[in-house]
Amino acid sequence: MLHHVGIEIAPADIEAAAGFFELIGFERVEPPPTLSEFTWLEHEGTQIHLMPEDEPTVPSPGHLAVVAPDFDAAVARLRDAGFKVQPKREHWGKPRVLAIAPGGHRVELMAAPPAAQV
């Protein structure tokens, strides 16, 4: 089971990035006191740790894939917030889109997890 993904991000982009992940179903959680400079978000036991870094590593061409509990509503919230949402070819008979989060990280939003379709 995946516990968390740590993402380096410029301090000026932390709030925007946290807002992006909140739009797709994550909620902020309190990090331990020793990591109070980080912003943590969680959804169904999986966490995203936004780690402030003055010179963040250039985002990789890879991506993070997230299953949205209410796919259509999550896509609408992203669009309403001004994010470009690019539909991708369907796999497993369910829709998916790609969006770029603040900081340049690619995030795939899926309507259903692959395991549910196998």
PLM ranges: what are they?
Residues 1, 56-61, 91:
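Short glycine-enriched loop/turn motifs at secondary-structure junctions
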Residues 1-18, 62-64, 115-118:
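N-terminal beta-strand motif that seeds the catalytic metal site of vicinal oxygen chelate
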Residues 8, 65-69, 100:
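Short hydrophobic/aromatic beta-strand micro-patches
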Residues 8-47:
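Core segments of cupin and vicinal oxygen chelate
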Residues 19-23, 77, 103:
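Structural preference for long, well-ordered alpha-helical segments within the folded cores
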Residues 38, 47, 65, 96-98, ...:
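Short hydrophobic/aromatic beta-strand element in the GNAT-like acyltransferase core
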Residues 62-83, 89:
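Mid-chain, well-packed structural core segment of small domains
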Residues 81-118:
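Vicinal oxygen chelate
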